[in-house]
Amino acid sequence: MKLFAFLTTLVLFVCVAQAQRVYPSHWYTGMKDRRLQLLIHDSTEIGKNVQFRSSSKDVRVVKVNTVSNPRYLFVDLELAATARPQELVFTYGAAGKAQRKLTYQLKARHSGNGRERVKGVHAEDFVYLMLPDRFANGDPTNDIIPGYRSNTADRANRYDRHGGDFKGIQNNFDYLQNLGITTIWMTPVIENDVTMMHEFGNNVAGYHGYWFTDHYQIDKRFGGNDGYREFCDAAHRRGLKVIQDAVYNHVSKEHWFVLDPPTDDWINNWPSFQGPSHREEVLFDPYASAYDRKVMLDGWFVDHLPDLNQRNPFLATYLIQHAIWTTENFGIDGWRVDTYKYCDEAFLNKVNEALYREFPAITILGEAWVNSVVGNAYFTRNNMQTPFRYNADGVIDFQTCFAMLAGMNKADGWMDGVNKIYSTLAQDVVYKDPMHNCIFLDNHDMDRVFSVAGEDPERLKMALNWLLTLRGIPQLYYGTEVLMKNFKNPNDAMVRMDFPGGWAGDSVNKFSRAGRSSLEDSIYTYISKLAQFRKKSPALTRGKMMQFIPRNNFYVYFRYTPEQTVMVMANTGNKPGEMRWKEWAERTKGFTKARDVIS
């Protein structure tokens, strides 16, 4: 009888271990904040009045939290200041019931944080944005992963996965560095184990990465957790930095904690589908209604992406610890935070503060597609008097993007053409430091800039000049350098095509000079020359700026330090511009000659 009882208990331990989820999946000693909250999810009920015991004196059990879903447990722990790396053993279960066993790893923090990795991204960097699924396929064996909900890789279908991965990007580090790139930003790499979703009239795969199903798994079609760590390490060895794309606002409806939520308020639920207003003004409008704020912050982005309630303390801690774990585990240098303006304000500051505490050099950029410079500045450190103040380093600077596109394409007007650039930059007074903003000409949600330029290479060059000489951190969208084009017609997939040459058997290989047309290669070379100059230019990477009021389509500004002055001139008209040297004398006085940095 005793033997039978022992075997029954042993079987229980094995079954529970197989069905048990524990997050964070491991943790680190040496954190400034020694608190840790474990989320435990079992396939069977854990029960009430749960006891939780640690095998190590290095870990103190502070509190055991049960929630409405009996399959969950949230355990507050505190690590000793002297805690060492080790394997912990926890036992837990309801009093008088069979106890469950959990082994857990404490690891040492990386000694290279802030020097070799987690270095931050700054104005001297040049960011390259790509969708990893669409850049290059370096390992065709991971295109199909048995057990995933959707298992196709069909390049003929622009809405399906195509097979790009980390290895494909690694294989082209030389290409990127020859272009002058210092930093790689990929759209999200976290697992999107989803069925094809019906979106905007099409069945779409999660190829873009924004539909998370398990935060602690990197998508195996990209290379998985081990492949991502290898990718980040290889990038750092080459002197490249990595930005990861975070999404705190929502997850896929097929995320495991949406299918079995811990609490009733884990998701921002509505009686029927309610999308956000997309009007960020309600967050700083002194006259805004509480209803409009709620719709903006709690509305679902689309109907298959449940909106996360970051006011739930357990969910907030889960997301914060995941951000810390990811940074330490993979050594990323910065975060670009998607859908920033739709997230709970206090939560965003809390997660940013936690990251800055553990990784003082890290960079955080909020992505908020906004309607004004004031809206832009609201989501970063600013000089405005508002009831709430954000703490992110900078923002993805849509207003400067729109201004550069207007300067590239539109005739000079009081507030249009190059005057839009002038007036937009004149409003930098609202930012604490606009040098931390990420500036760009297009991205994965916009028409490609070469198409917007009317496929005019001279217009494109003019816009590239601004991109690489204005204040801020410049970002290039993959393929711009080889004149990839398209409008978002009928949808975003049209501006997310495969990079030519990234797949075996491609008819052309634009990673190679021989595969590029003379025009394409001239643009690649143009960007490379300007980017390489910029990288070594104190004026462009840390200098002040002085701009002059545009006249007759002629816009002039200077970037300067005590040791260097760079003059940038743009004529957007169809006639020669007037060289008004007397007006520019306060920046040109004392100089007798200059050189063209491109020729």
PLM regions with names:
Residues 98-107:
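Edge beta-strands of extracellular beta-sandwich domains
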Residues 19-47, 108-111:
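Beta-strand/beta-sandwich contexts
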Residues 32-87, 92-95:
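Immunoglobulin-like IPT/TIG beta-sandwich domains and homologous Ig-like subdomains
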Residues 77, 564-571:
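Short, well-ordered beta-strand segments enriched in hydrophobic/aromatic residues
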Residues 135-329, 348-358, 368, 374-376, ...:
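Substrate-binding/active-site clefts of carbohydrate-active enzymes
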Residues 1-24:
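Bacterial Sec-dependent N-terminal signal peptides
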